C-alpha cells in the first residue's frame, strides 16, 4: 500500500513544477527501497496486527467508507460496538450523526468525541446525544500559542491528532493518521491511515482516555473539559472577534510596511536628485 501511495504521487508531479523529473525519480527510488523493507511492530500490545491504508489514490485506494468503522447497515454485525472514541479537529455533521445512531450500540456502550470547540457549531444536539464531548481547555489553547516570525502575531493552537478507537467485545481497532471525521476526508481526499488491532485487556476507550486526560476525566490535571453543542455559540462569537482583531493587525502591519516602503523610495529619490 505504501508503494501504491508513492506511485500515485509520481503520477501527480506536474510537469510545470520545478525539477519535476528529479522529484519523480526520488519518489521512484524511495518506492524501490521500500520493497526491500520488512515492517514489524515488535509490540506486545498490537503483535503484528497492522495495516497501512492509503485513501483517495484511485484504483488502489483503500475504501475507508466500507470499513467496519463506518458500517451503519442495520442488522450487520460490523455496525455495532461497545466503545467508540473519535478524536478529530474537523468534523462533518453526517459522519458524527452516523456514529451516534442508537442501533449501533451494544450493551453499556460508551461514545466519546474529542474535537475543537469551534467545530461544535456544525452539530445539532440530536447528532451527539449518545456522545460525551470534550475540547481543550481555554488555558491550554492560550498556553500553546504560536508566534509567527513574519508578523509576530499570536495564533492559537488546538488539537491536530486524528484517532479512532472502536471496541467490540474483546476486539479493539485503532486508526491513526491524517483523516478527519469529515465526509471529504473519508470519501474524497488523499489521506494515509494506519490500522492497528489489539485486545481489550491491552487497550480500550477508558484506558486511552485516562492516558490523554492524565487520569480521571474530572481531575484538575485533565487538559480537556466536557462540553455540549450549546457551548459553540459563545465560541463562534469569540472566534469572529479574534478573526477581526487578526485582520486589523494584518492591515496595520501592511500599512506600516507601505509607509516604510514609501519612506525608502523617497530617500532614494532624494539621493538620486542630489
Where are these regions (language model features)?
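PLD/PLD-like phosphodiesterase catalytic module centered on the HKD motif
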Residues: 1-274
